[in-house]
Regions:
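Conserved adenylate-forming
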Residues: 23-24
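Class I SAM-dependent methyltransferase Rossmann-like catalytic core
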Residues: 28-38
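Short, flexible segments with low predicted structural confidence
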Residues: 18-20, 30, 45, 69-70
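Conserved alpha-helix/loop element of class I SAM-dependent methyltransferases that forms part
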Residues: 20, 37-55
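A short, structure-level motif marking secondary-structure boundaries and short turns
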Residues: 28-30, 55, 79-81
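N-terminal auxiliary segments of SAM/dcSAM-dependent transferases
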Residues: 1-18
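Class I SAM-dependent methyltransferase SAM/SAH-binding core
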Residues: 58-116
């Protein structure tokens, strides 16, 4: 089931602000483009605080989309995050964006269904 189309819009938006396709990024530079939920990183920060997520934590994000929350958690809290996404195109782009942010050691992207993971 494909819920989101045009996942490459993130790359288009990054180009529009002067970022080349292979240029290194920070997780915060992606924030305006990769949060596919309400309230952006503010809601993620609240969840991190309430769940007491830290560098010692391991987090499973189900329905990770483009990986925005996973990268934000890894970058700000230092936690290890497994980002599980059903859509192959979103998962592939999320993995590339995470690599550009040098967070691949903290964030592991997996394409799969949470019912069988």
């Amino acid at each position: 089931m494909k819920l989101y189309c045009h996942v490459d819009r993130v790359l288009t938006e990054l180009r529009a602000v002067g970022k080349d396709d292979d240029e290194p990024l920070s997780a915060s530079e992606l924030t305006p483009f990769d949060q596919l939920h309400y309230h952006g990183t503010e809601s993620v920060d609240l969840a991190v605080e309430r769940a007491k997520i830290s560098a010692d934590s391991s987090v499973l994000e189900i329905g990770s989309g483009l990986g925005g929350p996973a990268r934000h958690i890894a970058a700000t809290a230092g936690a290890r995050v497994t980002a599980l996404e059903l859509q192959r195109d979103q998962n592939a782009l999320a993995s590339k964006l995470t690599a550009r942010c040098a967070l691949s050691e903290k964030v592991k992207h997996i394409c799969g269904d949470f019912l069988t993971y």
